[in-house]
Amino acid sequence: MTTRSAVVVGGNRVPFAKAGGPYAAASAQDLLTAALDGLVARFGLAGSQVDEVVAGAVLKHSRDFNLTREAVLASALDPHTPACDLQQACATGVEAVIYTANKIRLGQAEVCVAGGADSASDAPLVVSERLRRALLKASRAVT
C-alpha cells in the first residue's frame, strides 16, 4: 500500500488567556467555533465542506458531549461536514492532527481540520458526594 504525504497548510487560534479572564463566559464550543470561523475567513472556506473536522478536548463539560460537531454547525463551514471529538488526559489536539494526517496518508480524506478546545473557566468541577447532596437539597428549597 502506498501512502501519501499529509501537510499542514495553515492554522488559526484564539489567543491564550487566564481562566476567569476575557473568555470567562465562553464555553469550549464558543472558543472552537471562533477558531473555526477564523480559519474559514483566512482560507476562504465559507460554505465549504472539508472531509472531516476533528478536535480534542481534555476538560469536556457534559453539555459538550458532541463538541466538534456543534462547533461545525455553529461555524461558517458547510453543516454537512463530518466532525468528531477525541478525548484523553492530554495532547488531544496533537492526537487530532495525527488522526486526520493518517486519514489523508491512507487516502481516506483530502482536506481535514484538526485542533483542540478547552476552557479552564468552564471546566466541570467534581465535588464530594456529601457536597453534591447538600447542593441538590439546597436547590429544592423554597424561597
Language model feature labels by segment:
Residues 49-56, 113:
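Short glycine-rich phosphate-binding loop at a beta-alpha junction
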Residues 11-15:
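Short polar catalytic/cofactor-binding loops
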Residues 1-6, 18-47, 64-65, 69-143:
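Acyl-thioester C-C bond-transforming condensing/cleaving domain
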Residues 57-63:
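Glycine-rich phosphate-binding loops at beta-strand->alpha-helix junctions
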